[in-house]
Amino acid sequence: MSKQLEQEIAKRRTFGIISHPDAGKTTLTEKLLLFGGAINMAGAVKSRKIERKATSDWMAIEQERGISVTTSVMKFTYREHEINLLDTPGHQDFSEDTYRVLTAVDSAIMVIDSAKGVEAQTEKLMEVCRMRNTPIITFINKLDREGMHPLDIMADIEDKLQIECAPLSWPIGMGKDFKGVYNIYQKRLHLFTPGTESIDGQGQMIEDLDDPLLDELLGRQAVELREDLELLAGAATPLEYDQYLSATQSPVFFGSAVNNFGVQEMLDAFIDMAPAPGPRMAVSREVLPSEENFSGFVFKIQANMDPAHRDRIAFFRICSGKFTRGMKVHHHRLGKDISLANATIFMAQERANVEEAWPGDIIGIHNHGTIKIGDTFSIKEPLKFTGIPNFAPEHFRRVILKNPLKMKQLQKGLIQLAEEGAIQVFRPIIGADYIMGAVGVLQFEVTMARLKNEYSVDAIYEPISYQAARWVSCEDKKALAEFEKKNQSTLARDSEGFLTHLAQSDWMLNFFMEKWPNIDFHKTRENI
């Protein structure tokens, strides 16, 4: 491994932020970008007084609704480290996209609303992180409002998420009595001034809790802080770095993202603790980031990031080696060499051409319909990275076109949106319908809005009586052909041509599975 490759890997941190909707994820993202100097003013998320839109929510429907429905990738520098931040969809209907994003990160920050504790979406996302043993740092947000007691929040996290909490900061009061946080990690007291947004995170050094300065600064709350910290010393588990890396323990920080309070302390700890890019599993072997040969995979495709150019960008995670502009790589699914001439790096809606990039970096590759989610590019050795699946949809709708002359545009729009993985599209073997499938119902609304805005297609959708879908396969081609011939009314092909069984109920699905025991019915389809 070259010295430069080693240094570049060591200074990279690639992470995602996960939370339930409205826990403050987008606000935290803005503040992190502010510290990184990537933006001059935090995006004033959901503020009516300030018309500026949140930097990471760039799609029209996101700006309208105030939720993140796609994933933004943002790069910034902090303390001589290169940070790649993946802002995941916060709405529960977009778990597929979030799952794929979590395949591209090395660690995550989990945001918890102090008034609500662990919520449903957080539990789902943690399941995904647990599957991959993704290290998690927890930020307990909104301490400037009334909420649960910090010990109760940690008990809630440990109980529902099965991960041990190791507090590295501790709040002093909450709501109207919120005075600040004591950083256990740095032995510093940070005082909170309501209505201000300080990005000076120095704080007051207090190494000895018996220091009279503590009483001077906090008054009666100094006694409470001493009692809390004494209780913690006996009850809370001290941080074990190996347990954090193996995702069995989470360092916990408290703060208020909207007031930019407690954010820098967490960011500093993140830089010190979060892992640099690590090994990745391919079908044939484990790939180390330090290998000289370039490799990586596509985890997301986004259409029309720039409506003026009708472009499609493939989001690509570099797993090993160095990327240089114009380099030739092998596109394994298609079995041909391509040149990566116009790769970009992201700062939400702002993009810049990239001359070189390293393991952990996320680059955008212009895609004219030939790149799919899960594709691997590499030099020399044919590699196929694993674990980037499609999920069987749980909700279905039939598409009805208002103007039949727009059929061509509808086909193009649905195929492109299906390539992004935001929606799945099926054509029944019998009939000319387009059937959309999704993990969550909001995806249908988003798809219709995007068809109208980006493809000038006016369409509506109506319920259809399917309740489950399974991809079908069989090693015995003859048996599969017989199955297809005898069950045409229940079969469709997805946008990539894979045979799919559509069932009207779980009972019907089980009936078919029992009737055809030699046919495999798959809940997920690995992107091949």
Curated annotation (Swiss-Prot):
Main function: Increases the formation of ribosomal termination complexes and stimulates activities of RF-1 and RF-2. It binds guanine nucleotides and has strong preference for UGA stop codons. It may interact directly with the ribosome. The stimulation of RF-1 and RF-2 is significantly reduced by GTP and GDP, but not by GMP.
Know the name of this protein? Peptide chain release factor 3
Organism field: Desulfotalea psychrophila (strain LSv54 / DSM 12343)
Report any Pfam family annotated for this entry.
RF3_C
Is Nucleus there in the keyword field?
no
Quote the InterPro entries the UniProt record gives.
EF-G-like_DII (IPR053905), EFG_III/V (IPR035647), G_TR_CS (IPR031157), P-loop_NTPase (IPR027417), PrfC (IPR004548), RF3_C (IPR032090), RF3_dom_3_sf (IPR038467), RF3_GTP-bd (IPR041732)
Q: Record's GO cellular component, any one?
A: cytosol
Family statement drawn from the similarity comment of this UniProt entry: Belongs to the TRAFAC class translation factor GTPase superfamily. Classic translation factor GTPase family. PrfC subfamily.
